[in-house]
Amino acid sequence: MSAFWSDALRARRRIEIAKVAGAVALPAAISVATLSGLARADDVAAKLSYCKDCHGQSAQGYNGYFPIPRLAGQQTEYVKNQLQAFVERRRTNNIMFNVAHTLSPAMIAALADDFRRLNPPPFGGAPHPRAAEGRRIFEDGIPDANVAACAACHGPQATGSGQIPRLAGQLYPYVINKLVNWDRERGQNRAKPDTSAVMSPVAHSLNKSQIEAVAAFVSTLR
């Protein structure tokens, strides 16, 4: 099969998955059996291949109608925490719940470690004139709106740390979508509060234009 048709089939698959999110569970044939100890290399390779069908062969993300995040270079602890958040319904996404609840802790650790080592170029596509405004917000915050500098937590280069995510190179439309819909997707299990609560007042205090500016800036970083 040519590379063109392979890419086309993957794109069609992403759209189909997005349309049926929450309606059906993933087929048992693609689930991963619970592993004890270290995840086997062949199991990890198979699951990585499946993940990359949606997140991209270099984990660069998918910049389409249904934006799928960049995982390349992401903090390992953040990836592990978020996969568990899908399982515990602290973060809502029916597609990712169906993926995450099949994974053992060893498999999650192996996947997170692999994604951390990848470093493809940023996807691009953001309106560059907005990046200058976004940089000011990222570095200085918005004192009048009680918004702290993004860099205070995410680091001066937006690389994150521990359970604080890397934003550098993240897809422009994905960042916008997450901030606009923050309270509908994060911190949903009140019995298990998590670090997403820190971002709630920030997401509330930024208007759509400011969110777009920050997204434009971080999407260009390496």
How does the language model describe each region?
Residues 35-48, 58-67, 117-144, 165:
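Electrostatic cytochrome c docking/interface patches
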